Amino acid sequence: MYNVKKSIKLGIAPIGWRNDDIPEIGKENTYKQILSDAALTGFSGTEVGGCYPQDPAELNKELMLRGLEIPGQWFSSFIIRDGIASAMNAFEQHCAYLQAIHAYVAVVSEQTYSIQGIIDKCVYTEKPNFSDSEWQLLCEGLNALGKIANAHGLKLAFHHHMGTGVQTLPEVDRLMENTDPQFVHLLFDTGHIYVSDGDVMPLLSKHFDRIKHVHFKDVRNEKLKACRLAKKSFLNSFLDGVFTVPGDGNIDFKSVLAYLVGHQYSGWIVVEAEQDPKKYNPLEYAQKGKKHIDELLKNYL
């Protein structure tokens, strides 16, 4: 029988404390502080951030001291730009590290032509588009990377993302249709698909069978509208407060969670809200997000 408490683990991404795209943001927050805040708030783990140690033994000790786990870590693939062989070599090392820290998923985003880290490119109008041959290469490459992930006891979860070539529902459709479900799974990110398409449920319902990892990111509609009008970049949009933790924005997480539980989702739900930690206290917002999810989960416990 499906048991929500045993099937779903709650985690948080370090991106509320530190940001890998803008390293000076939140640099006063050490990885140990992030782990301690996550444990204090009652999360089961965090994803790996850029400030985390690359020595598995060091990280494993700090995790053990706090009773935490690592669900996964982001990997920027450049399959289209650099070719499959190059991506495989880098991903092999990535997966070896994730295996050593007992992770569950390798989160992959194809970053060829990505504008997510370009400060003066409007993320709402200037996203890249792949050609047919580039799509074919990408899907072949992801299948190859997925085999590597499986060999390390991991699942490759592809992250649809604003400012990339796989952002919209039709693009996710194409990726799912042309990759092998044995090797390529999907990360469902509420915030990215909401900003991109204006709705979260179509992607969730259409591709639930491929979803092996979930990010709960909320969106402030008034901030989003202002950033669209001002043609802001992805980085400036999050610095302006477009994203926040569940319950602090406008996404209907009650419906999202009802669907996940109703279809017996098993895996991690990771709160991910890239914000400026000077404006939005990371611990305070971690607690706010956790409280909202806990309230919603009460209906199923």
UniProtKB/Swiss-Prot annotation:
GO terms for biological process: inositol catabolic process. It holds the Pfam family AP_endonuc_2. Its cofactor is glutathione; Co(2+); Mn(2+). One of its GO terms (molecular function) is myo-inosose-2 dehydratase activity. InterPro entries: IolE, IolE/MocC, IolE/XylAMocC-like, Xyl_isomerase-like_sf, Xyl_isomerase-like_TIM-brl. Its EC number is 4.2.1.44. It catalyses: scyllo-inosose = 3D-3,5/4-trihydroxycyclohexane-1,2-dione + H2O. Keywords: Cobalt, Lyase, Manganese. PANTHER family: HYDROXYPYRUVATE ISOMERASE, INOSOSE DEHYDRATASE. Belongs to the IolE/MocC family. This is Inosose dehydratase. It comes from Salmonella typhimurium (strain LT2 / SGSC1412 / ATCC 700720). The gene is iolE.
